From Swiss-Prot:
Primary role: Involved in the apoptotic response after nerve growth factor (NGF) binding in neuronal cells. Inhibits cell cycle progression, and facilitates NGFR-mediated apoptosis. May act as a regulator of the function of DLX family members. May enhance ubiquitin ligase activity of RING-type zinc finger-containing E3 ubiquitin-protein ligases. Proposed to act through recruitment and/or stabilization of the Ubl-conjugating enzyme (E2) at the E3:substrate complex. Plays a role in the circadian rhythm regulation.
Protein name, entry field: Melanoma-associated antigen D1
Parts of the chain that traverse the membrane: none
Organism (species): Homo sapiens (Human)
UniProt main location, coarse: cytoplasm
Annotated segments matching region Disordered: 41-60, 78-123, 182-333, 376-412, 440-466
Length: 778
């Protein structure tokens, strides 16, 4: 009966997964097995009394059993849908024995595990078996193995479900069925070579079957007896049965059947301890449709093994919360208007403001028709503590009444005209006039002493009569002063002309300078040139050929000849020549720095000091040079006294070549000559217009001319140089008179750069220097 109940439960669990044909064939086979198993036992009393040793059936009974078993043997193998075996020996056999002696060894064992049920031990097995007769036990020796859907076994790929029948009793004893079951997604151990055959205690099974058959009310055997022995028994898990709406349902989800092997090769259990069933089974009513002679029992309740503790259930991690949605920033609203500005609670208030006792109230601007007739208002007096502001000056054209008394501490402005009747000490000299160190040995010139009349004429407010004769006299004096200054080749400053010669005629100094230029051009053939517009520096150059002025018959003729050679070296080296290059060219001429020349003197001082001071050369440091290096360039005076074209012609004449042989230098010199012609034409036009406006004509050069009134004392100590000796002034007189008659004696010619008075020694000296100094020019 237990076998029938087990087979029926297995059928209900398998019908959900098997096909229709397999289900029909399985039902037919099970019904035949049930009919055979319901045969009356031969000796029930003996089987119940002696569970350890069962009596074999007679020969006739054995023959009947063999015939029935042969007829009921199934021929088809079933395989659970989507099940996978992982071992070569995973064969599920449902066999039937013919020998009564082998019946105890072929007791069927079915292990079931409910769906999603948790096993509580590897050794907990539920056996629902009932002892039957010898024929029944012998006939019902088939074991059915079912596996849940998608369950996986690790027995091998050749696992099949066979319903076999043994024809020999001995073969039946050795054909012990092996039905491993395993739950979904669980794994069983692969069988090994030393797997032992299953041994079932015949006595215990016979006794328990006999008790269940005779007395349906007897409770189920204890869990300890239901467990298999340690020598290789299988662990079976039986799913609990529930009655829902009067129908018996059974869910097979996880069936674990583990084939037992030797003690050394068996896998260790997952949990410690052994599983034991409850001591008192609970019985329930038979479900509808169950046979009346079958006692329906509920599965034994599981108890926790010794030492077992509930494990903390794995908590589901909290769902990840999505970040809060980004909020739209608030729209910009109108800015809050400033309602209440900060107001000082206690502003500082002057309690007693200073009040002038007699404030001067300005009535408004008053236009006085006659400022000279200004009279004090009646009753007006100067305040006693009144002082003039430190930087205050009166209007330039305002004069007070003739009887206006000046305060005793009233400061006079620096340009205030002195009264005409103020007496001057006999030895009074202005503080800004230069005094030489040996001024005690010098006799001051009467022209240097200011006269009362000259001081009175400096009054800008007084109407100055335009005396042409007086202006021409100052212009002639300025001509002599310029020629004296230019004799030393030092540029002349405008401030020096105003201080030394023009003096009180500062308001008409442009006319005096223009008259002096007219005299220089018409009488001496010299032109006054302003070479620096910022510092207002002037030089004198000869017209129309400046080179004649450079190579004139003066005491500096050798120096100016050397200067012409130096200008050529600079021009042919790209308008600049380093100090090393220039000294190398001079060494080839026999001139060495540090060696004093009989005509030129100290060469280094001549090049780096005298020529630089006279603005013939420009001596400067090379930028970013370490150690410092210096180079030479053309000075401002050189551009006006000569030109690049004249220097290039001089070099070509010395080497007997054409100036156009040096194309780059010739084009540069030609461009400069054209620019100079344009500038000279514009300047000549401006001067002609100014002279017409001022009324300057040929009468300016008429009349006697004398050099006796030249004031040598106007030269400074540095400018005098060789003029410290009075006898050295004689060459200047000759030089001035030479220029006075130069225009009438020498015609204007452009024959070449070497132009001088009748082929004098200056031309020959420059030519000799050039022949030696320009041999390197190619």
């Amino acid at each position: 009966m237990a076998q029938k109940m087990d087979c029926g439960a297995g059928l209900l669990g398998f019908q959900a997964e098997a096909s229709v044909e397999d289900s029909a064939l399985l039902m037919q086979t099970l019904m035949e097995a049930i009919q055979i198993s319901e045969a009356p036992p031969t000796n029930q009393a003996t089987a119940a009394a002696s569970p350890q040793s069962s009596q074999p059936p007679t020969a006739n009974e054995m023959a009947d059993i063999q015939v029935s078993a042969a007829a009921a043997r199934p021929k088809s193998a079933f395989k659970v849908q989507n099940a996978t075996t992982k071992g070569p020996n995973g064969v599920y056999d449902f066999s039937q024995a013919h020998n009564a002696k082998d019946v105890p060894n072929t007791q069927p064992k079915a292990a079931f595990k409910s769906q999603n049920a948790t096993p509580k031990g590897p050794n907990a097995a539920y056996d629902f078996s009932q002892a039957a007769t010898t024929g029944e036990l012998a006939a019902n020796k088939s074991e059915m193995a079912f596996k849940a859907q998608n369950a996986t076994t690790k027995v091998g790929p050749n696992a099949t479900y066979n319903f076999s029948q043994s024809l020999n009793a001995n073969d039946l004893a050795n054909s012990r069925p092996k039905t491993p079951f395993k739950a979904w997604n669980d794994t069983t151990k692969a069988p090994t070579a030393d797997t032992q055959t299953q041994n079932v205690n015949q006595a215990k099974m016979a006794t328990s079957q006999a008790d269940i058959e005779t007395d349906p009310g007897i409770s189920e055997p204890d869990g300890a007896t239901a467990q298999t022995s340690a020598d290789g028994s299988q662990a079976q898990n039986l799913e609990s049965r529930t009655i829902i709406r009067g129908k018996r349902t059974r869910k097979i989800n996880n069936l674990n059947v583990e084939e037992n092997s030797s003690g050394d090769q068996r896998r260790a259990p997952l949990a410690a301890g052994t599983w034991r069933s409850a001591p008192v089974p609970v019985t329930t009513q038979n479900p509808p449709g169950a046979p009346p002679n079958v006692l329906w029992q509920t599965p034994l309740a599981w108890q926790n093994p010794s030492g077992w503790q509930n494990q903390t259930a794995r908590q589901t991690p909290p769902a990840r919360q999505s970040p809060p949605a980004r909020q739209t920033p608030p729209a910009w609203q109108n800015p809050v208007a400033w309602q209440n500005p900060v107001i000082w609670p206690n502003p500082v208030i002057w309690q007693n403001p200073v009040i002038w006792p007699n404030p001067i109230v300005w009535p408004g601007p008053v236009v006085w028709p006659n400022p000279l007739a200004w009279q004090n208002p009646p009753g007006w007096q100067t305040p006693p503590g009144w002082q003039t502001p430190p930087g205050w000056q009166g209007p330039p054209d305002w004069q007070g009444p003739p009887d206006w008394p000046l305060p005793p501490d009233w400061p006079l402005p620096p340009d205030w005209p002195l009264p005409t009747d103020w007496p001057l000490p006999p030895d009074w000299i202005p503080a800004d006039w230069p005094i030489p160190p040996d001024w005690q040995n010098l006799r001051p010139s009467p022209n240097l002493r200011p006269s009362p009349n000259s001081r009175a004429s400096q009054n800008p407010g007084a109407a100055q009569p335009r005396d042409v004769a007086l202006l021409q006299e100052r212009a002639n004096k300025l001509v002599k002063y310029l020629m004296l200054k230019d004799y030393t080749k030092v540029p002349i400053k405008r401030s020096e002309m105003l201080r030394d010669i023009i003096r009180e005629y500062t308001d008409v100094y442009p006319e005096i300078i223009e008259r002096a230029c007219f005299v220089l051009e018409k009488k001496f053939g010299i032109q006054l040139k302003e070479i620096d517009k910022e510092e207002h520096l002037y030089i004198l150059i000869s017209t129309p050929e400046s080179l004649a002025g450079i190579l004139g018959t003066t005491k500096d003729t050798p120096k100016l000849g050397l200067l012409l050679v130096i200008l050529g070296v600079i021009f042919m080296n790209g308008n600049r020549a380093s100090e090393a290059v220039l000294w190398e060219a001079l060494r080839k001429m026999g001139l060495r720095p540090g060696v004093r020349h009989p005509l030129l003197g100290d060469l280094r001082k001549l090049l780096t000091y005298e020529f630089v001071k006279q603005k013939y050369l420009d001596y400067r440091r090379v930028p970013n040079s370490n150690p410092p290096e210096y180079e030479f360039l053309w000075g401002l005076r050189s551009y006006h006294e000569t030109s690049k074209m004249k220097v290039l012609r001089f070099i070509a004449e010395v080497q007997k070549r054409d100036p156009r042989d040096w194309t780059a230098q010739f084009m540069e010199a030609a461009d400069e000559a054209l620019d100079a012609l344009d500038a000279a034409a514009a300047e000549a036009e401006a001067r002609a217009e100014a002279r017409t406006r001022m009324g300057i004509g040929d009468e300016a050069v008429s009349g006697p001319w004398s050099w006796d009134d030249i004031e040598f004392e106007l030269l400074t100590w540095d400018e005098e140089g060789d003029f410290g000796d009075p006898w050295s002034r004689i060459p200047f007189t000759f030089w001035a008179r030479y220029h006075q008659n130069a225009r009438s004696r020498f015609p204007q010619t452009f024959a070449g750069p070497i132009i001088g008075p009748g082929g004098t020694a200056s031309a020959n000296f420059a030519a000799n220097f050039g022949a030696i100094g320009f041999f390197w020019v190619e």
